[in-house]
Amino acid sequence: MQLSFSRPRPWTLLLMVVSNLLLWENVSSGNLNSNETDGDLLLHRGLFDTATRLSQDIRDLDIEFLRMYAVNEVSEKLYNKHMLEFIEDMDFVVKALTCCHNYSIKTPENLDEAQQIPFNDFPWLILSRMWGWNETSKNLLTILRSIPGMHDDVISLAQAIERKLAELFEYTQSILTLIFGPTENVDRSIFSGLEDLKASDEELRFFALCKFSYCLRVDLQTIELYFKLLQCAVNVNSNVCLSINSEDSS
């Protein structure tokens, strides 16, 4: 079976923020160094590029992980039922997303809301998500290893996701420390529902994996967007800013 997941394009209006980035509250009073050298900008760019590539790699692994689980652990009838619900039934998707660990971390829905975000809140917004998924991936791997007969390829992909999330978390901390300094008081909530993987009901098990996969992909896309916005704040004239504006106008 081939996994058919529509790629979400959430929060399009948030992209409009880039053209008004310097109008944000607290931007001018943030910890950014206005006298950064070319070397500093290259360092930032390298870290952002690596972090974004890692995030994209994780999303690719996530797709393959769910596909491998579906092929080896789920009946074709149940698979088709859930895929149709995720693709066609928005109420079902909303129900799934309200179960994500970070649903309380509100993402702006329009330009007015985005302009109200204090610039120095970005470390908390990003690290809260990253910490949650870093810990959740460890829990997922522990649970999968405890399930008798779990396919080796499923466990191997879960290991790869866990390793890359840990690496992405380290790069994210480095980026945010360079720009803002140390970040404290991160929201340490994790994804809920993984215990359903141990349930005897096949549908509960598969839904738990679908929910994990979908929420992880949405959060990683959000983090990638925040990386772009931060990169523009560090270097307003970067190609990233131009690409975001082009994406918004398309």
Curated annotation (Swiss-Prot):
A Gene Ontology term for the protein's cellular component: extracellular space
Tissues with expression: Expression restricted to placental tissues. Trophoblast giant cells are found to be the major source.
Molecular function via GO: hormone activity; prolactin receptor binding
Stretch forming the signal peptide: 1-29
Disulfide bonds: 100-215, 232-241
Similarity comment: family membership: Belongs to the somatotropin/prolactin family.
Designated name of the protein: Prolactin-7A2
